């Protein structure tokens, strides 16, 4: 029997909505990355995009354990010499909480063309509202919450 390889036309994509309120950032990112890759489906193939769309709301209420809020630093580079910028997570979560979740999920996806395609299916919003109601997203509940 030959190994099954999913074809692009056979893949059925769902929309999932995750509430990030009081959920630890790393746990949230692992669940989101699993849904984006499609590892929860029996038709998963590591070289094909079989994943679903993920909408994360309440990104501003995400939890960080320990002293990460004060000590963890997010880096970015402008592309010019001496253009390395750094921002603490305390400031990042107040200014752009969506970016903190995007960085965490992006680090858990493949670092190639497929990963760049998968990250486009992640939609993160700081508040409780999102414009994807027409897609009828299914609520995805994460059991573990911050202590």
Curated annotation (Swiss-Prot):
Which Pfam families does the record cross-reference, listed alphabetically?
Ribosomal_L13
Keywords for this protein: Ribonucleoprotein, Ribosomal protein
InterPro entries membership: Ribosomal_uL13 (IPR005822), Ribosomal_uL13_bac-type (IPR005823), Ribosomal_uL13_CS (IPR023563), Ribosomal_uL13_sf (IPR036899)
Per UniProt, subunit arrangement is: Part of the 50S ribosomal subunit.
Q: Does the keyword Transcription regulation apply?
A: no
What function does the entry list? This protein is one of the early assembly proteins of the 50S ribosomal subunit, although it is not seen to bind rRNA by itself. It is important during the early stages of 50S assembly.
List the record's Gene Ontology CC terms alphabetically: cytosolic large ribosomal subunit
Among the GO molecular function terms of this UniProt record, one is:
mRNA binding
GO BP annotations of the record are: negative regulation of translation; translation
Q: What is this protein called?
A: Large ribosomal subunit protein uL13
Write out the coiled-coil annotation as residue ranges.
Answer: none
UniProt family annotation = Belongs to the universal ribosomal protein uL13 family.
Q: Is this entry keyworded Ribonucleoprotein?
A: yes
NCBIfam families associated with the record: rplM_bact
């Amino acid at each position: 029997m030959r190994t099954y390889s999913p074809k692009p036309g056979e893949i059925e994509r769902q929309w999932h909505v995750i509430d990030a309120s009081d959920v630890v950032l790393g746990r949230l990112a692992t669940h989101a990355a699993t849904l984006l890759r499609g590892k929860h489906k029996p038709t998963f193939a590591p070289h094909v995009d079989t994943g679903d769309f993920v909408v994360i709301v309440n990104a501003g209420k995400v939890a960080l354990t320990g002293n990460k809020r004060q000590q963890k630093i997010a880096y970015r580079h402008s592309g010019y010499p001496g253009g390395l910028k750094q921002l603490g997570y305390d400031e990042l979560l107040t200014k752009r909480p969506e970016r903190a979740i995007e960085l965490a999920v992006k680090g858990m996806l493949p670092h190639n063309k497929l990963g760049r395609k998968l990250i486009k299916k992640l939609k993160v919003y700081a508040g409780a509202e999102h414009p994807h109601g027409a897609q009828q997203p299914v609520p995805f509940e994460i059991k573990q919450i911050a202590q």
